Each structure stands twice: as C-alpha cells, then as structure tokens.
A protein has these predicted regions:
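Flexible, solvent-exposed loop segments that connect beta-strands
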Residues: 48-52, 126-127, 295-303
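Sec-dependent N-terminal signal peptides
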Residues: 2-17
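Surface-exposed coil loops of outer-membrane beta-barrel proteins
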Residues: 110-181
Length: 368
C-alpha cells in the first residue's frame, strides 16, 4: 500500500496528464498492427482585458489518427495525420502528416525521431510554455529521449517549428528543451518533496535564408521545490506548497524590447483530492519574457507593439477537475484567475475539454 501511495502521489502531483493522452507501451507485441486514435474537443475562453494581452476564445477540436506497426519488440513505426479545426471556420486550420520511428529501451524509456508524443506531455510550467499549445501545437516534429520511473521523469527533446530552404525569406525556428522532476525519498511518513527543473532554448535564425529580422536565441529556465503532506487516508489527496524560480535570457543580447535578462518567482499553495486540484499563488516578475510562454505572465505586451511593463505582480488561483472514464475518455473543467495588483484588474480563463484516446489492434502480421 505504501508503494502504491508513493507512485500514485508522484503522478497526481507532477503530471496533470490526460489518461487518454499518455503514451501507450505496445512494443512488446511484435508483428502487430494498431490503429491509434487521439481526439481533443476544447473550449478555452480567455476573459482578458489588460495592456499585456487581450481576450480571445479558442474553440474547436483536433483529430490525430495513426497506424502503428511493430516490427520488433523494441521498434515501432507510426504514420498518420494531425487535423485541427476551429469552430465556425468550416475548414481545417492545420493539416499535417505525422510520422515517427521509436526505439524502446524498456517500458519506461524510449528514443524517437519524427512526430513527438504531444506538447502537453513535456509537463512544463505555463509561464514559459503556454498550456494552450495543447490545442494549437499538439503535434511537434523533431527528436526526443524520454525516461520515467517511480521517482523521476526526464524528457529531452528538439522540435523544429519552421524549416528553411536556400533563398527563403524567413527564419528557421526551433526549440530544445529538458523537463526533469525527481521525487525525493520520504524524510517523514506523510511528507513528499519533489524537485522540478525545466530548460527551454528558442532559436530564430538560419544561415541559408535571406530574411530581414535578426537572429535571436532565448534561454528560459525554471527551478523549484514542491512539498506536500497527505491530507487524508486516500493516497491521492495532498496539500502543500510550491516555490518556483524562473529566469529568461536573450543569449544574443538583441531582444526587440531591450529585455535581455529577467526573472520571476511563483509561490503557491495547493490542494489535491482525487480528481480535483486547487491552487492559490503569488507571481512577481521583473523584465520576464518567454517566447512560448503564456503572455498573461509576461512583461512584454502581445497586444501593443513596443509596450513593456517591467515589473508584474499577480495574485493567481486555479481549479481543475478531471473525470476519467474507462481509461479512454476524460472530461476536464478548469478555471484560472489572475489579479494584477498594479493595474488593479482581474482576468480569468475557463476551459472545457473532452479528450478521447484509444489503441486498437487491427491485424497480426506474425507468420504462422
């Protein structure tokens, strides 16, 4: 029971992942052909009204069907398509092929080239990797090495957002990242301490393209500690604190807003009971900018050109309820609130998701 409690608590506290979106381990079933279905129907209404970011609504769905072939116990090949549509457009806003080859060292460690497992599964913090990328940029392309265990999670990847050819007039865009979490051995019967470390490098440039913009490279890091105590007899109920330090740097020292170095701190109280979680926190930053982050936390305006509010102070709160059904379907309701103490404005976001994921065996190719 103690072993089960530790394992469950680690995943409940650290992941927030959809059961439907987790990567299935199927490489042990050699010479089989599978159909993998991944679907997310979403509504996210951002009621923002401040100089940094204006309100907008994301509503739509994506469908990502894939055919997976397992030629060997450790090798799998996947081919499919990612289809993204926003409601009211009457069309697909994004249609892209997905293809990957994966080598599995074990049931918890793999190396992949091609389409990665999904942007939300990096388990990154919202201020430097916007959780809305789950809707807008789910299917990343590049290479990835991931390993996880009872006490740790490590995801190292490189994703290519924009490829350039000789003579192009645009920049190549790529992101390299590391997401690491470690659950310390218990120092008290009811106390659990986790240490997260996250790193992102975002590059805009390229040598063979003829573009007007300058080469830019940004480094964002997050390091913190999360401590929780058992809040009841249930192994998936906890309460605790989390403190995370963020830094943002322009490695090329040429940020368009003259912000070449910034920092932030996020201090939160949290509570978890089964499928529900509640957080209350305080965010303070100085010249903080993350290219892929949620602009609600940023010092740089996404709304008005050249506007920078160097010092930001926010009181934050969130509620999340996730209801799974038979490990293939999940319903999620989430609320996020932000009160800017300097601007004296309250902004909020409401999210509704229904996510479906299913792996279906369609044929056995093994010779009899």
């Amino acid at each position: 029971m103690m072993r089960r409690s530790v394992i469950l608590s680690f995943f409940i506290v650290t992941t927030g992942l959809s059961l439907a979106g987790q990567e299935p381990y199927i490489s042990q079933n050699a010479e089989n052909l599978y159909l993998k279905l991944n679907n997310l129907n979403f509504v996210r209404n951002n009621e923002y009204s401040n100089p940094i970011i204006e309100g907008y609504t994301l509503i739509g769905y994506f469908l990502q069907p894939e055919i997976i072939y397992i030629p060997d116990e450790k090798v799998s090949v996947s081919l499919g398509a990612h289809l993204l549509s926003y409601s009211g457009t009457g069309r697909f806003s994004k249609i892209k092929p997905v293809f990957s080859t994966t080598f599995s060292f074990s049931d918890s460690t793999f190396f992949r080239i091609g389409t990665l497992t999904g942007s939300d599964e990096h388990r990154l913090q919202d201020p430097h990797f916007n959780k809305e990328r789950l809707y807008t940029d789910f299917a990343e392309d590049g290479l990835q090495f991931r390993s996880s265990g009872k006490r740790y999670f490590s995801d190292t990847w490189l994703s290519w957002q924009n490829f350039i050819f000789r003579g192009d007039n645009k920049r190549e865009i790529l992101t390299a990242g590391e997401s690491f979490r470690y659950l310390l051995p218990r120092i008290a019967p009811n106390l659990r301490i986790e240490v997260p470390f996250q790193l992102l490098i975002k590059h805009f440039g390229g040598q063979i393209s003829d573009y007007d913009q300058q080469v830019e490279t940004y480094l964002n890091m997050a390091l913190g500690i999360r401590a929780g105590i058992d809040a009841g007899k249930s192994p998936d109920s906890m309460a605790g604190i989390e403190c995370i330090y963020f830094s943002g740097n322009s490695l090329t020292k040429n940020s368009p807003w003259d912000i070449n170095k910034g920092y932030a701190g996020w201090y939160k109280l949290f509570g978890i009971y089964k499928n529900a979680s509640l957080e209350a926190g305080y965010w303070h930053s100085d010249n903080y900018y993350a290219p892929d982050g949620n602009f609600i936390f940023s010092s740089v305006s996404d709304r008005f050109e050249d506007l920078v509010i160097s010092e930001r102070s926010l009181i934050t709160g969130s509620f999340n309820l996730t209801l799974p059904w038979k490990d293939m379907l999940e319903f999620t309701f989430a609320f996020d609130g932000y009160y800017d103490t300097d601007l004296r404005r309250f902004d909020n976001a409401v999210t509704l998701n229904i996510r479906f994921g299913k792996l279906i065996k369609i044929a056995s190719l093994r010779e009899k």
